[in-house]
Design a protein with these regions (language model features):
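A short glycine-rich, Lys/Arg-flanked "PGG" loop and its adjoining helix->strand segment in the class I
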Residues: 76-90
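Short amphipathic alpha-helical segments
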Residues: 54, 73-74
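Conserved binding-pocket/active-site segment within a compact domain
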Residues: 44-46, 60-62, 79, 83
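A short SAM/SAH-binding and catalytic strip from SAM-dependent methyltransferases
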Residues: 59-73
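Class I (Rossmann-like) S-adenosyl-L-methionine-dependent methyltransferase catalytic domain
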Residues: 1-55, 91-197
């Protein structure tokens, strides 16, 4: 989910305003609130149509929303609106295509009618990245399988990428057997990574 991937990034503070655009039944909103975030809001046209649709938030999540919008123009409009609401980043997830999923689906427009009679647009990783670039002229960064982030805050993006590289370096050093007998080097890199990532 977007919320799980978002929590893994450690991008925000407890005071960050997070808006779940198309929140469904509110599972991600609940998860973020249980994780200590105070300013989490959700809106969904079907389940929470009367909730306030925020006009500005630090972070906006868009979990599996693009998959269920049948009209291509409405799909693009939704993505653009969610992106415009975010001041720091938009985190979104999409269903990726797989043979298991598609074997029971009926082709319809640019997507499928699922086995439970709902519209689904499945994407390949290359297709969703091209779609985002065509609309926003920005390359999304992959957080997890089918989950991406589009930064609006360049400093935050650089901070995220730096911490990600430090984390990868720390994992490499911890796994590298040539450091087995060099406790000092391994411990030093590990402490440095912990300091940077905290």
């Amino acid at each position: 989910s977007c919320a799980g991937a978002f929590l893994d990034t450690t991008l925000s503070t407890i005071g960050s305003v997070i808006f779940d655009y198309g929140c469904g039944r509110g599972d991600d909103v609940s998860l973020l609130k249980k994780s200590g975030y105070k300013n989490v809001f959700g809106w969904d046209p079907h389940f929470f149509p009367d909730s306030k649709k925020l006009s500005k938030a630090d972070f906006v999540t868009l979990s599996f929303v693009l998959n269920v919008i049948e009209d291509k123009d409405e799909r693009s409009k939704t993505l653009l609106e969610a992106y415009s609401i975010s001041s720091k980043a938009l985190i979104f997830s999409v269903m990726l295509d797989s043979q298991n999923t598609l074997q029971y689906a009926i082709p319809y427009n640019d997507g499928y009618i699922s086995s439970i009679s709902t519209f689904q647009k499945y994407y390949s990783p290359a297709e969703i990245e091209e779609y985002i670039y065509a609309l926003l002229k920005i390359h999304p960064l992959k957080l997890a399988n089918g989950v991406y982030i589009i930064f609006k805050d360049e400093f935050l993006q650089q901070d995220y990428l730096f911490k990600k590289q430090i984390g990868l370096l720390a994992q490499t050093v911890k796994q590298d057997t040539s450091f087995e007998n060099d406790f000092y080097s391994t411990e030093l890199v590990s402490q440095f990574a912990d300091l940077i990532l905290s």
